[in-house]
Every structure is written in C-alpha cells, then in structure tokens.
Amino acid sequence: MLDTQYSQYIQHRIDQKTKPLGALGLLEKVAHQLALIQSQGKETAVEHIELNKPRIIIFAGDHGIADEGVSIAPSAVTQQMVLNFLSGGAAINCFCAVNNVEITVVDTGILLPVESDSDMLISQRLGTRTNNFANEAAMSLETVERGIELGTELVSRTISNGTNIIMFGEMGIGNTSSASAILSALANRTADECVGLGTGINNEQLARKVAVVKQGIARCINPDAKEVLSQVGGYEIVQMVGGFLGAYENRTPVLVDGFIVSVAAYVATLIEPSCRDYMIFAHRSEESGHKILLELLDAEPLLDLGLRLGEGTGAALAMPIIRAAAEFYNNMASFASAGVTV
C-alpha cells in the first residue's frame, strides 16, 4: 500500500498552480499518483516527476483454445505478428516510435518459435502453447508459478536498467477467450457478459466462443486466482500477472492497456491488492468485458478511442498524456511565483 504521508503536500502543490482547482481534470490525478509513487521511501515529497526510459513489454503466447474456432485467424498469425513487431511494421511500433517508447517482445510459448538475433526478443517459453481449456486445464499450477516468477524477474531487470514507467502489451490468437474465461470465473460474471468479438468474429463464432468459455469455467470450482489461471489462462497472461507484481515490488507505475492486460492487472490485485496503487489505466477498450474490469478496479481510463487491437497500443498512445501530467507538475508556475492573485 502506498505511503500517503506526502499526499496532502502533493495535492497542495498541484492546487497552487496557476489554474482553477481541478481544472486539469484527470491530468491532476495522474500527476498526484506519479508524484506519490516517486516519493515512496524518500525524506520529502518529490518536486520533479521523472519519466525515464519508458518501455513496453509485449508478451506473446499461443492458445490451445484456438482450435475451437474462436478467432478469425489461425495460431500461425501469432508468430507472424511477432516477426512484424521485430521488423517494426506493427501499429505498436508506429505508436512507440512517435512517443519515444522502447519495445521488448517476449516469447512466452508460441506454436512456431521465432528464430531471431534481435535485441528486442526474449525467450521465456513455458511450452509450445497452452492446452485446449475447453477439454482440460490450460496448464499446470507449477507452470503458473513459473510464469509469474519469470514475469516478475523480467520487469525487475527492466527497472534495474533505468526504466521507471512501464507498459505491457500482448499477442496471442485465442487470448480474448482466455481473458474472458478468467474474468468470468474470478468476478463471478456470466460468460455472455465477459465474452466479446475479439478479432472481429461473426455471430456464429461468438456463440461458439461463449460455449467454450462456459466449458472452461465449469472446472473453475475453486475461485483461487492461480487455480483459475491454471484452468483457463494463457502463458502471456500469467507472465503479465508476474510483471504487475514485479512493478509493485519495485515501486514503479504501470500504464495499463486494454482488456487482456487489464485481466492480468485484476488477477495481480487478487494476489497482492496493493499493486493497484501503481496502475494507471490508459484507455477504455471496445471489448465488452473491459467495462466490468474498469468497474472492478475502480479505474478511470485516460482515453476512449474505440480501440480493440491489443499489442499495448492504447498504453503507447496515452504516453503523451503521462508526459503532460509530469510537465505541468514540474514546470507550471504557482500563483505566488507568477504573481497572479485570486
């Protein structure tokens, strides 16, 4: 849990800027959260928010549930998109380039491994792909534990290399089915409420997707977060859960992307509730389950652009807002310094 001893001072500093109280809306909340995070363990509150080496980690993994026809694309597309990330051709590459965000791509277990000597690629494979959770557990509990550990360690290394704001993205054909099943099982919501169109499936595919999610969650008798990950999770989701826990352990904010990343964020809060304090929600996804997650996490997203791509695109697009929040906190004049009387 965040130490709030400097909260009042930080809010006073924001309120004394040359503007009406609250006039910068969500920017003020973001600035307050960032300043409070960066004041943890310090003798005084920070006067200057630092944003160093922002980085997005894209976790890629394949899903056995893809065999059930729950996506418009085959599993081979996961590998193809990883190659696209590495060559700089994806949407996330464009948005990171324009916003000065570095990219790491993690193979958590894709069907067709990528042969590349790119510095962007890290292999943390938990398997070839998950099992088909319509019929059996997606992975063992031991694999869940190992995946969380790998995600935590990767984020800790990233932070030790100078990054102090981090984002997660994901890629994996079938992963909206996994995320929907996790949400349904842990939040006690129906599959119909949690399942969305994903990559743009038709009504027949949507009905099939709901049916297989119901099959998977029928085995989720134990509401324990790790048990649910074992039954219906994905390798990339498990490692993102670990990533959120790693950011919490290192007192580092995470700019949270859309539906699938938010599912991982939710699971992380069930394991360690205090990690919620380090999350800033980038955008509101078009996926139906994301509204449920934002309510569960009491989150007010920065953007609402109708996005449903994934990859971390919403987080990268929100980075200029984060920079603007830091800039006004750091450099906007106070009434006293500007000689403005009100």
Swiss-Prot record:
SUPFAM superfamilies: Nicotinate mononucleotide:5,6-dimethylbenzimidazole phosphoribosyltransferase (CobT). This is Nicotinate-nucleotide--dimethylbenzimidazole phosphoribosyltransferase. It catalyses: 5,6-dimethylbenzimidazole + nicotinate beta-D-ribonucleotide = alpha-ribazole 5'-phosphate + nicotinate + H(+). Pathway: Nucleoside biosynthesis; alpha-ribazole biosynthesis; alpha-ribazole from 5,6-dimethylbenzimidazole: step 1/2. GO terms for biological process: cobalamin biosynthetic process. HAMAP family: CobT. It is an enzyme of class 2 (transferase). It comes from Vibrio atlanticus (strain LGP32) (Vibrio splendidus (strain Mel32)). GO terms for molecular function: nicotinate-nucleotide-dimethylbenzimidazole phosphoribosyltransferase activity. Pfam families: DBI_PRT. PANTHER family: NICOTINATE-NUCLEOTIDE--DIMETHYLBENZIMIDAZOLE PHOSPHORIBOSYLTRANSFERASE (PTHR43463:SF1). Keywords: Cobalamin biosynthesis, Glycosyltransferase, Transferase. Its EC number is 2.4.2.21. CDD domains: DMB-PRT_CobT. NCBIfam families: cobT_DBIPRT, PRK00105.1. The active site is at 311 (proton acceptor). The keyword DNA repair does not apply. Catalyzes the synthesis of alpha-ribazole-5'-phosphate from nicotinate mononucleotide (NAMN) and 5,6-dimethylbenzimidazole (DMB). Belongs to the CobT family.
